[in-house]
Amino acid sequence: MENLNIDMLYIAAAIMMGLSAIGAAVGIGILGSKFLEGAARQPDLVPLLRTQFFIVMGLVDAIPMITVGLSLYVMFAVV
C-alpha cells in the first residue's frame, strides 16, 4: 500500500509539470499573436508593446518553473 502512494505522488508531479507547461505554451502563443496583432495595427507603439510583451511573457513563463519546484517538493519531501 505504501508503494502505491509513492507511485501516485510521482504521477501527480508529472501531471502538474505537464499541465503547467501546456498552459504556459498556450498562454505564450496567445500573447505572441496579440503582440503581433497590436504591432500590425499601430507600428509606432512597437517599443512600448515589446516591453510589456517581455514582462508578461516572463511572468507567464515563471508559472512552470514554480510548478517544477512544487512537484519536486511533492516527490521528495512529502514522502
Swiss-Prot record:
UniProt entry keywords in alphabetical sequence: ATP synthesis, Cell inner membrane, Cell membrane, CF(0), Hydrogen ion transport, Ion transport, Lipid-binding, Membrane, Transmembrane, Transmembrane helix, Transport
Bilayer-crossing regions: 11-31, 53-73
Site (Reversibly protonated during proton transport): D61
Membrane topology: Multi-pass membrane protein
InterPro entries: ATP_synth_csu_bac/chlpt (IPR005953), ATP_synth_F0_csu (IPR000454), ATP_synth_F0_csu_DDCD_BS (IPR020537), ATP_synth_F0_csu_sf (IPR038662), ATPase_proteolipid_c-like_dom (IPR002379), F/V-ATP_Csub_sf (IPR035921)
Location(s) in or outside the cell: Cell inner membrane
Pfam families, alphabetized: ATP-synt_C
Primary localisation category: membrane
GO molecular function: lipid binding; proton-transporting ATP synthase activity, rotational mechanism
A GO CC term attached to the entry: plasma membrane
NCBIfam families: ATP_synt_c, PRK06876.1
Family membership: Belongs to the ATPase C chain family.
Subunit structure: F-type ATPases have 2 components, F(1) - the catalytic core - and F(0) - the membrane proton channel. F(1) has five subunits: alpha(3), beta(3), gamma(1), delta(1), epsilon(1). F(0) has three main subunits: a(1), b(2) and c(10-14). The alpha and beta chains form an alternating ring which encloses part of the gamma chain. F(1) is attached to F(0) by a central stalk formed by the gamma and epsilon chains, while a peripheral stalk is formed by the delta and b chains.
Function (record text): F(1)F(0) ATP synthase produces ATP from ADP in the presence of a proton or sodium gradient. F-type ATPases consist of two structural domains, F(1) containing the extramembraneous catalytic core and F(0) containing the membrane proton channel, linked together by a central stalk and a peripheral stalk. During catalysis, ATP synthesis in the catalytic domain of F(1) is coupled via a rotary mechanism of the central stalk subunits to proton translocation. Key component of the F(0) channel; it plays a direct role in translocation across the membrane. A homomeric c-ring of between 10-14 subunits forms the central stalk rotor element with the F(1) delta and epsilon subunits.
Name the UniProt record assigns to this protein: ATP synthase subunit c
Organism: Blochmanniella floridana
Organism classification: Bacteria, Pseudomonadati, Pseudomonadota, Gammaproteobacteria, Enterobacterales
